Swiss-Prot record:
PROSITE patterns: SERPIN. Transmembrane segments: none annotated. Belongs to the serpin family. The reactive center loop (RCL) extends out from the body of the protein and directs binding to the target protease. The protease cleaves the serpin at the reactive site within the RCL, establishing a covalent linkage between the carboxyl group of the serpin reactive site and the serine hydroxyl of the protease. The resulting inactive serpin-protease complex is highly stable. Variability within the reactive center loop (RCL) sequences of Serpina1-related genes may determine target protease specificity. It comes from Mus musculus. This is Alpha-1-antitrypsin 1-1.
Length: 413
């Protein structure tokens, strides 16, 4: 029987605690000179922005009535690492599917960009708890190509484990233990079933624990209605916050835009469409517009009502990536001969992406710097996130989209 690669791509964003900071704003937060402007960062951010939106639109095409949550960074990292061992059309499809222009960007620069991104995300000195991990699980009688192994370790910080896939329960435990440890127990059963021909598995995770500089006050949280659609309403715990916030209305998107900063180097962008404008928002949203929001912040007195929620996403990447042009790797025409020294052809038989996000009131106070700002004497806007909305969480040094999601029903986990 022809061996095949079974690849489980696994992601976690665990205990994502949104803590708004309207009293602890630092002038440097709007100073773009503080951002990492290296070519590697710029390159990866540009491509990941395009990739994230393309992937999101494909998910909407598959189902526009459910919550969406995924990590463009996690998915792109795993496929980019796999490209190290691919050749021919398989290789080209992967990198072009990740939105890289191979006539303008060398393969070496692509992998250096990912290396720089992972080093930035895994900085131990950051206030933001953000870590990633890549695990290569190799059948004990399979020998990997040394060049692939060295580059996977060097560029993608990959850990290598020798396992016996003939003992599927034992192999699952090794993979699941790796992910469970890396995600601090948030994903305990990442792999439920392995294909019988599996000889190689790749697991990627990302753990994100974000706290706002100033938390919501739980005493202000009250039960309120959330309108899933025109005929469906659910009850949710609705958090409330008032103060000087980065909020404005974007006529291009027909949506309200809210930016909220984490302690550390991450920002969440929330997009609340006007009535009946969700489809317009999804069709019009672009990485250029998001970049403008991040660079040109507008603070004003405002009040927001935001649902406490916990959502997750689990996706079959074969059906998700194929419309983006990544098809060869999943069929018998795949060329992954740069991974193993064996002559038997390999293909990607399984590709799974999992993500979890929690938003609640908890968080930590930052050293407060009181900022007084004159504002026009007009009625402050009241934003009620009581109908479906989008959000994107960015790492600020690289301007890379870590997570992208859509909340349709905050009660559906």
């Amino acid at each position: 029987m022809t061996p095949s690669i079974s690849w489980g791509l696994l992601l976690l964003a665990g205990l994502c605690c949104l803590v708004p900071s309207f009293l602890a704003e630092d002038v440097q937060e709007t100073d773009t000179s503080q951002k990492d402007q290296s070519p590697a960062s710029h390159e990866i951010a540009t491509n990941l922005g395009d990739f994230a939106i393309s992937l999101y639109r494909e998910l909407v095409h598959q189902s526009n009535t459910s919550n969406i949550f995924f990590s463009p960074v996690s998915i792109a990292t795993a496929f980019a690492m796999l490209s190290l061992g691919s050749k021919g059309d398989t290789h080209t499809q992967i990198l072009e599917g990740l939105q890289f222009n191979l006539t303008q960007t060398s393969e070496a620069d692509i992998h250096k960009s990912f290396q720089h991104l992972l080093q930035t995300l895994n900085r131990p000195d950051s206030e933001l708890q953000l870590s990633t991990g890549n695990g290569l699980f190799v059948n004990n009688d399979l020998k990997l190509v040394e060049k692939f192994l060295e580059e996977a370790k060097n560029h993608y910080q990959a850990e290598v484990f020798s396992v016996n896939f003939a003992e599927s329960e034992e192999a699952k435990k090794v993979i699941n233990d790796f992910v469970e440890k890396g995600t601090q127990g948030k994903i305990a059963e990442a792999v439920k079933k392995l294909d019988q021909d599996t000889v190689f598995a790749l697991a990627n995770y990302i753990l994100f624990k974000g706290k706002w500089k100033k938390p919501f006050d739980p005493e202000n949280t009250e039960e309120a209605e959330f309108h899933v659609d025109e005929s469906t309403t659910v009850k949710v715990p609705m958090m409330t916050l008032s103060g000087m916030l980065h909020v404005h209305h974007c006529s291009t998107l027909s949506s309200w835009v809210l930016l909220m900063d984490y302690a550390g180097n991450a920002t969440a962008v929330f997009l609340l469409p006007d009535d009946g404008k969700m489809q317009h928002l999804e069709q019009t949203l672009s990485k250029e517009l998001i970049s403008k929001f991040l660079l040109n912040r507008r603070r004003r007195l405002a009040q927001i009502h935001f649902p406490r929620l916990s959502i997750s996403g689990e996706y079959n990447l074969k059906t998700l990536m194929s419309p983006l042009g990544i098809t060869r790797i999943f069929n018998n025409g795949a060329d992954l001969s740069g991974i193993t020294e064996e002559n038997a052809p390999l293909k990607l038989s399984q590709a799974v992406h999992k993500a979890v996000l929690t938003i609640d009131e908890t968080g930590t106070e930052a050293a407060a710097v009181t900022v007084l700002q004159m504002v026009p004497m007009s009625m402050p806007p009241i934003l009620r996130f009581d109908h479906p909305f989008l959000f994107i969480i960015f790492e600020e040094h690289t301007q890379s989209p870590i997570f992208l999601g859509k909340v349709v029903d905050p009660t559906h986990k």
